[in-house]
Amino acid sequence: MRTATVIAATLVLGTIVAAQQPLFKRTVVQQADLSTPGREVIQAVGEFQPGGTPGRHTHAGEEVGYILEGTLSVEQGDKPAVIFKAGQGFVIPAGQIHNATNTGTGVAKILATYIVEKGKPLATPAK
């Protein structure tokens, strides 16, 4: 009986921890002014749980992405989605509505470099 209780408690706690984990998380690792007035560079690591996505959005500048781990389906505007795997990269033009979704079964990670207008939000949800 005690073993069954411990197993049940472990399952419940595991479910709670999994439920609290966000499906997408962006962590800024570096930010600096550029020599071009009004522009800055921001580097961030995006972590996507399976099925995770930031949702359709834009940036006030270019995004250069490099897949560190996993598989992402990237949509740009009305174009068909393109699948990118670890070791591949892509460029998103300034103001382009886009989205990325982890289509794999494990965590996907991306290193994203943004060359953006200083003082503007890094990402703006698409309308």
Give a label for each model feature.
Residues 56, 65-66, 75, 91-92, ...:
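Structural recognition of the beta-strand scaffold that forms the well-ordered cores
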